Protein backbone atom coordinates (compact mmCIF):
# COMPACT_ATOMS: atom_id res chain seq x y z
CA UNK A 1 0.00 0.00 0.00
CA UNK A 2 1.22 3.52 -0.80
CA UNK A 3 2.60 5.43 2.17
CA UNK A 4 0.10 8.28 1.74
CA UNK A 5 -2.67 5.77 2.34
CA UNK A 6 -1.46 5.76 5.95
CA UNK A 7 -2.58 9.33 6.59
CA UNK A 8 -3.94 8.43 10.03
CA UNK A 9 -0.67 6.80 11.05
CA UNK A 10 1.29 9.85 9.84
CA UNK A 11 -1.09 12.21 11.64
CA UNK A 12 -1.01 10.39 14.97
CA UNK A 13 2.80 10.28 14.80
CA UNK A 14 3.01 13.97 13.88
CA UNK A 15 5.12 13.16 10.82
CA UNK A 16 5.28 14.56 7.31
CA UNK A 17 5.54 12.02 4.49
CA UNK A 18 8.83 11.81 2.59
CA UNK A 19 6.88 11.89 -0.69
CA UNK A 20 4.09 14.47 -0.84
CA UNK A 21 2.55 13.07 -4.05
CA UNK A 22 2.03 9.44 -5.08
CA UNK A 23 0.16 7.60 -7.84
CA UNK A 24 -1.74 4.34 -7.42
CA UNK A 25 -1.37 1.58 -10.00
CA UNK A 26 -4.54 2.73 -11.78
CA UNK A 27 -3.51 6.38 -11.97
CA UNK A 28 -5.18 7.92 -8.91
CA UNK A 29 -3.14 10.86 -7.65
CA UNK A 30 -2.77 11.24 -3.87
CA UNK A 31 -1.37 14.53 -2.60
CA UNK A 32 -0.50 15.41 1.01
CA UNK A 33 -1.49 19.05 1.61
CA UNK A 34 -0.72 19.59 5.29
CA UNK A 35 -1.09 17.76 8.58
CA UNK A 36 -4.21 15.57 8.41
CA UNK A 37 -5.11 16.72 4.88
CA UNK A 38 -4.91 14.58 1.73
CA UNK A 39 -6.38 15.19 -1.72
CA UNK A 40 -7.32 12.25 -3.95
CA UNK A 41 -7.76 12.93 -7.66
CA UNK A 42 -8.95 10.31 -10.18
CA UNK A 43 -7.59 10.10 -13.73
CA UNK A 44 -9.21 12.82 -15.86
CA UNK A 45 -11.01 10.30 -18.05
CA UNK A 46 -12.70 8.79 -14.98
CA UNK A 47 -13.61 12.05 -13.20
CA UNK A 48 -17.40 12.33 -12.82
CA UNK A 49 -17.47 15.96 -11.71
CA UNK A 50 -18.05 15.45 -7.96
CA UNK A 51 -15.90 17.10 -5.29
CA UNK A 52 -16.34 15.18 -2.02
CA UNK A 53 -14.99 16.49 1.29
CA UNK A 54 -14.85 13.90 4.07
CA UNK A 55 -13.83 15.24 7.49
CA UNK A 56 -13.51 13.57 10.88
CA UNK A 57 -11.59 14.18 14.08
CA UNK A 58 -12.83 17.76 14.51
CA UNK A 59 -13.22 16.38 18.03
CA UNK A 60 -10.16 14.26 18.73
CA UNK A 61 -11.83 11.56 20.82
CA UNK A 62 -14.50 10.71 18.23
CA UNK A 63 -12.61 7.82 16.71
CA UNK A 64 -15.16 5.71 14.80
CA UNK A 65 -15.43 8.28 11.98
CA UNK A 66 -11.64 8.63 11.89
CA UNK A 67 -11.27 4.86 11.52
CA UNK A 68 -13.92 4.86 8.77
CA UNK A 69 -12.00 7.44 6.72
CA UNK A 70 -8.80 5.47 7.35
CA UNK A 71 -10.40 2.34 5.87
CA UNK A 72 -11.62 4.21 2.79
CA UNK A 73 -8.19 5.72 2.24
CA UNK A 74 -6.51 2.32 2.61
CA UNK A 75 -8.88 0.89 -0.02
CA UNK A 76 -8.01 3.70 -2.43
CA UNK A 77 -4.26 3.42 -1.81
CA UNK A 78 -4.36 -0.34 -2.45
CA UNK A 79 -6.38 0.10 -5.64
CA UNK A 80 -9.39 -1.77 -4.23
CA UNK A 81 -11.60 1.35 -4.40
CA UNK A 82 -11.34 3.25 -7.68
CA UNK A 83 -12.58 6.80 -7.23
CA UNK A 84 -14.40 8.75 -9.89
CA UNK A 85 -14.77 11.75 -7.58
CA UNK A 86 -12.15 14.18 -6.32
CA UNK A 87 -11.89 13.70 -2.56
CA UNK A 88 -10.41 15.74 0.25
CA UNK A 89 -9.78 13.76 3.44
CA UNK A 90 -9.43 15.95 6.53
CA UNK A 91 -8.57 14.99 10.11
CA UNK A 92 -9.74 18.09 11.91
CA UNK A 93 -7.83 18.37 15.18
CA UNK A 94 -4.64 16.24 15.05
CA UNK A 95 -3.31 17.33 18.44
CA UNK A 96 -6.56 16.40 20.19
CA UNK A 97 -6.55 13.08 18.29
CA UNK A 98 -3.06 12.33 19.61
CA UNK A 99 -4.20 13.10 23.16
CA UNK A 100 -7.49 11.23 22.83
CA UNK A 101 -9.37 14.35 23.91
CA UNK A 102 -12.37 16.19 22.48
CA UNK A 103 -10.24 19.33 22.18
CA UNK A 104 -7.16 20.81 23.87
CA UNK A 105 -7.99 24.47 24.53
CA UNK A 106 -11.27 25.13 22.74
CA UNK A 107 -13.82 23.37 20.57
CA UNK A 108 -12.76 23.68 16.92
CA UNK A 109 -16.36 23.12 15.82
CA UNK A 110 -17.36 26.43 17.40
CA UNK A 111 -14.78 28.44 15.46
CA UNK A 112 -15.99 28.50 11.85
CA UNK A 113 -17.73 31.15 9.74
CA UNK A 114 -15.31 33.80 10.98
CA UNK A 115 -15.48 32.92 14.69
CA UNK A 116 -11.75 32.01 14.72
CA UNK A 117 -10.88 35.60 13.77
CA UNK A 118 -11.91 36.81 17.24
CA UNK A 119 -10.14 33.96 19.03
CA UNK A 120 -6.56 32.82 19.56
CA UNK A 121 -4.55 29.65 20.10
CA UNK A 122 -3.65 26.78 17.82
CA UNK A 123 -7.23 25.50 17.52
CA UNK A 124 -8.36 28.87 16.15
CA UNK A 125 -5.49 28.66 13.67
CA UNK A 126 -6.55 25.13 12.77
CA UNK A 127 -10.14 26.24 12.09
CA UNK A 128 -8.76 28.95 9.81
CA UNK A 129 -6.61 26.36 8.01
CA UNK A 130 -9.55 23.98 7.60
CA UNK A 131 -11.59 26.78 6.04
CA UNK A 132 -8.71 27.56 3.67
CA UNK A 133 -8.29 23.90 2.67
CA UNK A 134 -12.03 23.51 2.05
CA UNK A 135 -12.26 26.77 0.08
CA UNK A 136 -9.33 25.78 -2.12
CA UNK A 137 -10.77 22.31 -2.71
CA UNK A 138 -14.21 23.66 -3.63
CA UNK A 139 -12.86 26.44 -5.86
CA UNK A 140 -13.30 24.70 -9.21
CA UNK A 141 -16.44 25.88 -11.05
CA UNK A 142 -19.21 23.73 -12.50
CA UNK A 143 -18.69 20.76 -10.20
CA UNK A 144 -20.97 19.14 -7.61
CA UNK A 145 -19.89 19.82 -4.02
CA UNK A 146 -20.65 17.45 -1.14
CA UNK A 147 -19.31 17.57 2.43
CA UNK A 148 -19.87 15.04 5.20
CA UNK A 149 -18.39 16.03 8.57
CA UNK A 150 -18.42 12.83 10.63
CA UNK A 151 -18.82 12.75 14.41
CA UNK A 152 -19.79 10.60 17.36
CA UNK A 153 -21.55 12.00 20.42
CA UNK A 154 -20.38 12.44 24.01
CA UNK A 155 -23.66 10.92 25.26
CA UNK A 156 -26.08 8.19 24.27
CA UNK A 157 -28.98 8.86 21.94
CA UNK A 158 -32.51 7.53 21.52
CA UNK A 159 -31.88 7.97 17.78
CA UNK A 160 -28.33 6.77 17.31
CA UNK A 161 -27.47 7.93 13.80
CA UNK A 162 -28.67 11.31 12.61
CA UNK A 163 -27.59 14.30 10.55
CA UNK A 164 -27.71 18.07 10.91
CA UNK A 165 -28.49 19.97 7.70
CA UNK A 166 -27.25 23.60 7.74
CA UNK A 167 -29.33 26.61 6.73
CA UNK A 168 -28.82 29.55 4.40
CA UNK A 169 -31.31 32.28 3.63
CA UNK A 170 -32.93 31.71 0.23
CA UNK A 171 -31.65 28.15 -0.16
CA UNK A 172 -33.90 25.09 0.13
CA UNK A 173 -32.98 21.77 1.67
CA UNK A 174 -32.63 18.98 -0.90
CA UNK A 175 -34.98 15.98 -0.91
CA UNK A 176 -32.37 14.09 -2.97
CA UNK A 177 -29.70 14.62 -0.32
CA UNK A 178 -32.08 13.58 2.47
CA UNK A 179 -32.87 10.36 0.59
CA UNK A 180 -29.14 9.75 0.17
CA UNK A 181 -28.68 10.16 3.93
CA UNK A 182 -31.50 7.71 4.59
CA UNK A 183 -29.83 5.18 2.29
CA UNK A 184 -26.62 5.74 4.27
CA UNK A 185 -28.32 4.67 7.49
CA UNK A 186 -29.34 8.00 8.99
CA UNK A 187 -32.51 7.65 11.06
CA UNK A 188 -33.24 11.36 11.49
CA UNK A 189 -32.22 14.75 10.12
CA UNK A 190 -32.36 18.08 11.92
CA UNK A 191 -33.25 20.82 9.43
CA UNK A 192 -31.60 23.93 10.81
CA UNK A 193 -33.16 27.37 10.41
CA UNK A 194 -30.44 29.86 11.38
CA UNK A 195 -26.72 30.44 10.72
CA UNK A 196 -24.20 28.33 12.61
CA UNK A 197 -20.49 28.29 13.44
CA UNK A 198 -19.74 24.60 12.78
CA UNK A 199 -17.63 23.28 9.89
CA UNK A 200 -20.50 21.95 7.77
CA UNK A 201 -22.31 25.29 8.09
CA UNK A 202 -19.23 27.05 6.71
CA UNK A 203 -18.97 24.84 3.62
CA UNK A 204 -22.74 25.06 3.06
CA UNK A 205 -23.06 28.80 3.56
CA UNK A 206 -19.78 30.10 2.13
CA UNK A 207 -18.76 27.45 -0.42
CA UNK A 208 -22.11 26.28 -1.82
CA UNK A 209 -21.65 22.62 -0.93
CA UNK A 210 -24.39 20.24 0.15
CA UNK A 211 -23.02 19.81 3.67
CA UNK A 212 -23.98 17.78 6.70
CA UNK A 213 -22.81 16.99 10.20
CA UNK A 214 -23.31 13.25 10.69
CA UNK A 215 -23.60 11.78 14.19
CA UNK A 216 -22.83 8.06 14.11
CA UNK A 217 -23.09 6.83 17.71
CA UNK A 218 -21.23 7.22 20.98
CA UNK A 219 -17.61 8.38 21.21
CA UNK A 220 -15.15 5.64 22.13
CA UNK A 221 -11.33 5.28 22.06
CA UNK A 222 -9.44 3.97 19.02
CA UNK A 223 -9.97 0.24 18.50
CA UNK A 224 -13.12 0.11 20.65
CA UNK A 225 -15.78 0.98 18.08
CA UNK A 226 -17.33 -2.44 17.54
CA UNK A 227 -20.60 -1.03 18.87
CA UNK A 228 -20.71 1.76 16.28
CA UNK A 229 -22.33 0.31 13.16
CA UNK A 230 -21.30 2.33 10.11
CA UNK A 231 -21.80 -0.42 7.51
CA UNK A 232 -24.58 1.35 5.60
CA UNK A 233 -22.71 4.64 5.62
CA UNK A 234 -19.47 2.99 4.53
CA UNK A 235 -21.26 1.21 1.68
CA UNK A 236 -22.89 4.42 0.47
CA UNK A 237 -19.63 6.39 0.72
CA UNK A 238 -17.88 3.79 -1.42
CA UNK A 239 -20.70 4.08 -3.97
CA UNK A 240 -20.40 7.87 -3.99
CA UNK A 241 -16.63 7.61 -4.39
CA UNK A 242 -16.60 5.08 -7.23
CA UNK A 243 -19.75 6.35 -8.94
CA UNK A 244 -21.82 3.21 -8.40
CA UNK A 245 -24.72 4.79 -6.46
CA UNK A 246 -28.17 3.47 -7.40
CA UNK A 247 -30.32 5.91 -9.40
CA UNK A 248 -31.71 8.69 -7.23
CA UNK A 249 -35.31 7.62 -7.82
CA UNK A 250 -34.59 4.35 -5.98
CA UNK A 251 -33.91 6.26 -2.75
CA UNK A 252 -36.78 7.45 -0.56
CA UNK A 253 -37.42 9.28 2.69
CA UNK A 254 -39.36 6.33 4.15
CA UNK A 255 -38.46 5.90 7.81
CA UNK A 256 -36.49 9.15 8.01
CA UNK A 257 -37.60 11.36 10.91
CA UNK A 258 -37.33 15.10 10.29
CA UNK A 259 -36.94 17.71 13.01
CA UNK A 260 -36.50 21.48 13.10
CA UNK A 261 -34.92 23.73 15.71
CA UNK A 262 -37.42 25.33 18.06
CA UNK A 263 -34.92 27.15 20.28
CA UNK A 264 -31.27 27.13 21.27
CA UNK A 265 -30.41 27.25 24.96
CA UNK A 266 -27.53 29.72 25.38
CA UNK A 267 -25.38 29.73 28.51
CA UNK A 268 -24.86 33.35 29.55
CA UNK A 269 -22.99 33.01 32.84
CA UNK A 270 -21.38 30.69 35.37
CA UNK A 271 -24.73 30.70 37.20
CA UNK A 272 -26.30 28.70 34.37
CA UNK A 273 -28.03 25.51 35.54
CA UNK A 274 -29.46 22.82 33.29
CA UNK A 275 -32.24 20.83 34.98
CA UNK A 276 -31.49 17.52 33.27
CA UNK A 277 -29.87 14.29 34.46
CA UNK A 278 -26.17 14.11 33.56
CA UNK A 279 -26.78 10.93 31.56
CA UNK A 280 -29.84 12.10 29.62
CA UNK A 281 -29.83 10.87 26.02
CA UNK A 282 -30.10 12.96 22.88
CA UNK A 283 -33.68 13.10 21.53
CA UNK A 284 -35.20 12.68 25.00
CA UNK A 285 -38.73 14.11 25.06
CA UNK A 286 -39.62 16.96 27.43
CA UNK A 287 -43.11 17.76 28.70
CA UNK A 288 -44.76 21.14 28.16
CA UNK A 289 -44.20 23.26 31.28
CA UNK A 290 -40.90 21.58 32.23
CA UNK A 291 -38.26 24.00 33.60
CA UNK A 292 -35.27 23.17 31.43
CA UNK A 293 -32.67 25.72 32.52
CA UNK A 294 -32.03 28.87 34.55
CA UNK A 295 -29.42 31.62 34.35
CA UNK A 296 -28.66 35.11 35.65
CA UNK A 297 -31.25 37.90 35.63
CA UNK A 298 -34.00 35.35 36.28
CA UNK A 299 -33.60 33.90 32.78
CA UNK A 300 -35.66 30.71 32.52
CA UNK A 301 -36.16 28.21 29.72
CA UNK A 302 -39.56 26.54 30.08
CA UNK A 303 -40.81 23.99 27.56
CA UNK A 304 -43.65 25.49 25.50
CA UNK A 305 -43.50 23.27 22.42
CA UNK A 306 -45.53 20.07 22.04
CA UNK A 307 -43.31 17.13 21.13
CA UNK A 308 -40.12 18.95 22.13
CA UNK A 309 -36.89 16.97 22.44
CA UNK A 310 -33.41 17.93 23.60
CA UNK A 311 -30.15 17.28 21.77
CA UNK A 312 -26.55 18.16 22.67
CA UNK A 313 -27.23 19.24 26.27
CA UNK A 314 -23.91 20.41 27.71
CA UNK A 315 -23.85 22.82 30.66
CA UNK A 316 -20.02 22.86 30.62
CA UNK A 317 -19.68 24.95 27.45
CA UNK A 318 -18.14 28.40 27.66
CA UNK A 319 -20.38 31.37 28.40
CA UNK A 320 -22.05 32.65 25.26
CA UNK A 321 -22.20 29.24 23.61
CA UNK A 322 -25.06 26.84 23.01
CA UNK A 323 -25.78 24.51 25.94
CA UNK A 324 -28.49 22.52 24.17
CA UNK A 325 -30.96 22.54 21.29
CA UNK A 326 -34.72 22.14 21.60
CA UNK A 327 -36.15 20.45 18.52
CA UNK A 328 -39.64 19.57 17.31
CA UNK A 329 -40.97 17.25 14.59
CA UNK A 330 -40.95 18.70 11.06
CA UNK A 331 -42.47 17.79 7.70
CA UNK A 332 -40.96 17.38 4.23
CA UNK A 333 -42.88 20.41 2.94
CA UNK A 334 -40.66 22.98 1.28
CA UNK A 335 -37.89 20.62 0.21
CA UNK A 336 -36.28 21.26 -3.16
UniProtKB/Swiss-Prot annotation:
Binding residues annotated for Zn(2+), in chain numbering: 59, 62, 151
Cofactor binding note of this UniProt entry: Binds 1 zinc ion per subunit.
Cofactor(s) needed by this chain: Zn(2+)
Pathway: Amino-acid degradation; L-arginine degradation via AST pathway; L-glutamate and succinate from L-arginine: step 5/5
Active site: 215
InterPro entries xrefs: AspA/AstE_fam, AstE_AspA_cat, Aste_AspA_hybrid_dom, SuccinylGlu_desuccinylase
Record keywords, A-Z: Arginine metabolism, Hydrolase, Metal-binding, Zinc
Purpose of the protein: Transforms N(2)-succinylglutamate into succinate and glutamate.
Family to which the UniProt record says this protein belongs: Belongs to the AspA/AstE family. Succinylglutamate desuccinylase subfamily.
Matches recorded under NCBIfam families: arg_catab_astE, PRK05324.1
PANTHER family registered for this protein in UniProt: ASPARTOACYLASE, SUCCINYLGLUTAMATE DESUCCINYLASE
Protein name (database record): Succinylglutamate desuccinylase
